[in-house]
Each structure stands twice: as C-alpha cells, then as structure tokens.
A protein has these predicted regions:
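Beta-rich, blade/repeat-based domains predominating
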Residues: 43-56, 85-99, 128-144, 171-185, ...
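A short beta-strand motif characteristic of beta-propeller blades
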Residues: 36-43, 78-84, 120-127, 164-170, ...
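Conserved beta-strand positions in repeat-built beta-propeller and related beta-rich domains
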Residues: 61-65, 102-108, 147-151, 190-194, ...
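Short loop/turn segments that connect beta-strands within beta-propeller blades
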Residues: 72-77, 115-120, 158-163, 201-206, ...
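Structural motif
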Residues: 111, 239-240, 281-287
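C-terminal motif of bacterial Sec signal peptides marking the signal peptidase cleavage site
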Residues: 16-18
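Bacterial signal peptide processing site
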Residues: 20-22
Length: 305
C-alpha cells in the first residue's frame, strides 16, 4: 500500500540546536541546487533502512529494522531479496560487483553475505572466520571484498570463496570502520563514527587522517561520485560533501523524526538518495535530494497509510 506524502513549505532559520521543529521532522536544504522529496516509506514495505545502493535503475536497501534486503523499482511496493530466515539480523552496508552479485555486512550477525545475480542468498564468510561485527564494505580493485569489523577494529579482505585475510590491523588506530568507499587514484576512504574521523588509505597503504577533531562532525556513511565524497552524519543530522579543494560543506540538515540520516547513494543522473531511521516510531524513509527548484525548509507532514 502506498502512502500519501505531504510536503509543506515553511519559512524558518534552521539551527542545529532547534528550530521549532514539528512532530514529523524537518529538512533544510543548504545547497539550493537541490530539493528533497520522499521516495519510499514504511508503508511501501520497508522498516528502517540503513545502507542503500543505486544499481541499474533500482534502489537496493539494507533494511536493518526489518532484517532483510529489499529492492525498490519505482513501483508501489518493494521486493525482498532475503530476510531473517537466512540468519541475518541487522544488515548494514552493501556493494555490488560488475556482474550483479550483491554483497552486504551485518553488524549483529557478523559475516559477509551475498545475493548472487541469480537471486541465491548465502553467507560467504561468517563469524567462524573471525568476522564478528561487520560494518563498512568496499569492492577492492582485485575483486576481493573489504569488510570493516567494529569489534575487532580491523579491516579484512575476503575472497569470493570465503577466504579471510587481514587488510588493516587494529594497530592502525581505526576503532569502528563504519563505512568505506574507493575514491579517485585508488584511494580508499574509511569513516570511523566512533572516533569521528575520516581516513584516506593510499594505494601504498599510507593511512591519512583527512577530517578529525571537528565539532559537529561524525561520519556515518560515505559515498563517492562525480569527484565528490558525500558524507551522512546521523549523530548531528547532516548530509555533507567533501573535496580536497573546498573541504567539508554541509548540503542538507535534518531534524526531529528525520534527524537520523544513515545511508547515501546516487543514481545515474547524479541525484542523491538518503535513508532515514525513525527508531522511536519504528519507521523509515528514503528521501531523494534532487536537482529541482530551490526550496529552503521542508518539514515532513503526516504519513497517511
């Protein structure tokens, strides 16, 4: 069943400390080349999505609260790829290879999981291989899957047949490799939302602290597209962009029930999508941040089933 989405315009100067936010939440677009629109809600068949990924015209979602992987294809409902019957508990982040094989992590069940291009779902390497609480994930140039573990404070490399080896050990200082993505020139970006640090790992495995000790900054999910690193911050309710030339810039701020912004991805046209969790109400949203007419503040009104 679809829901009626009502977006009301408001005039307000947004402050992170509060702005007369209503019970339903508010979105402030700082970059006026974008405007938000609610795309998917709990009424469409999701619970509380975390990681999201745009692939071949479809939005793939790690539905953390629903213990499932789901796909939205512009229709009224979503399709479930796999669920808790497989053994997954809280799917976290995901990546897809060039052949359409989907890999994802689970910070509660642990392990690296796969839904292959034929729709067969299985665990590639589980807790028995030392993957206790898997978070960030990235597809390495070698074809192996890099997986961050928040309990062991390490990053592992996993082959397609489930062989696990150490990629970055705990001595490198990353406490919680929450999200990972490759940027330009073979650099791997790693978000640590425990220590509030954005790292960059060069091809020579030199680990650099790109952003740290910044008030109001805690990287949740990172995504690289069009020479820009996009960063969500669920702790402070922000979507930002980073380039070496311009530094860190806030694009969108979220408040109220829309505060906890999680995943981020881009479609083929460069439109942004973010996932939002309202865990108090056990509801979730996917919001498109698209290139349309500029709007300042858009509070989300009631969601009518």
């Amino acid at each position: 069943m679809t829901s009626t989405r009502s977006l009301l315009l408001a005039s307000c100067v947004f402050l992170l400390a509060g702005c007369g936010v209503d019970d339903h939440g508010m979105i402030l677009v700082v970059d006026h080349s974008y405007v938000p629109a609610v795309t998917v809600t709990t009424s469409d068949g999701i619970t509380t999505p975390d990681g999201i990924l745009w692939w071949h015209g479809k939005l793939i979602m790690a539905d953390e609260g629903g213990r499932a992987l789901r796909v939205w294809n512009h229709g009224p409902d979503v399709v479930t790829l796999c669920d808790r019957s497989l053994g997954i508990l809280e799917p976290e982040d995901l990546v897809v290879d060039g052949e359409g094989n989907l890999f994802f992590t689970d910070d509660t069940a642990g392990g690296l999981w796969e839904v292959d291009r034929n729709g067969h779902a299985f665990v590639v390497a589980g807790r028995s291989k030392g993957l206790f609480s898997t978070e960030g994930i990235a597809l390495a140039p070698s074809g192996d899957i890099l997986v961050g573990d928040g309990v062991r404070h390490e990053v592992f490399s996993v082959t397609r047949d489930g062989r696990v080896s150490q990629f970055l050990d705990a001595n490198r200082g990353i406490t919680k490799p929450e999200s990972m993505v490759y940027g330009e020139n073979g650099n791997l970006y790693i978000a640590d939302n425990h220590d509030d640090v954005l790292y960059r790992l060069t091809p020579a495995k030199k680990l650099e602290r790109v952003l740290e000790n910044r008030e109001g900054f805690s990287p949740e999910t990172i995504w690289f597209a069009n020479h820009v690193l996009y960063i969500t911050d669920s702790k402070h309710g922000k979507l930002s962009r980073y380039t070496p030339e311009d530094g860190l810039e806030t694009m969108v701020a979220f408040a109220g029930k829309l505060h906890d912004v999680c995943g981020v991805t881009t479609d083929d046209q460069g439109q942004l999508y973010v996932s939002i969790q309202d865990n108090e109400s056990d509801r979730g949203y996917v919001v498109k941040i698209g290139h349309d007419a500029a709007k300042d503040v858009i509070p989300l009104a009631a969601q009518h089933d």
